[in-house]
């Protein structure tokens, strides 16, 4: 359901300091965020693909967070982060950071609103790791669109409640707050955090292949038609969810989008 204002109690939240996490796998909770409970047609139809696959009969709970509910979660359970959260110079920084508090407090799966769910995520959730995925396929060599460093996108993340890496991310928000969006809270921030975590010799973060969670790059035409997702599932047999890259910053970059379709995951097998 939609959380319009007050979020439900969060057993895993830290108020006066981090609490020991559950030794458990990722719970079946789907988190998504929108400015209000009133979704546009595009977002509503894509969200429905995910709530249909991940339903109550399968033990799932789908939460739609509003801006108001996100701020209330931070105010209530993460008061030490509230000043940074309120002080962001870009609302998208709040949107990006809110998903970290959701995952720390409740655990589960975070997906951007422009994802379609082609298959159940149940198989990948049998893990105690923090899960992320590559934003580009390993074969990507385009000099402009594929940086030398491999991007880990923050449009999909999954974690057990109170995972240590989620705490690590939250603790890094203050130091990065004044940076540009990409590196303050976005994919650059997440990529750097994964690198820093691993450089310290820590484990518990797993990076899934691009085709598993994204299925198409933002700067190429999507190979699937949104009105025929059954066909899309057949075209992308190794893909669990796929992003149609409908976010506002991606729309601004539409002029840079190439006309050819992304075929990197067509027929790919897990």
Where are the predicted features?
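Glycosyltransferase-associated regions of secretory-pathway enzymes
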Residues: 1-95, 113-270
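Small-residue hinge/turn detector
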Residues: 96-108
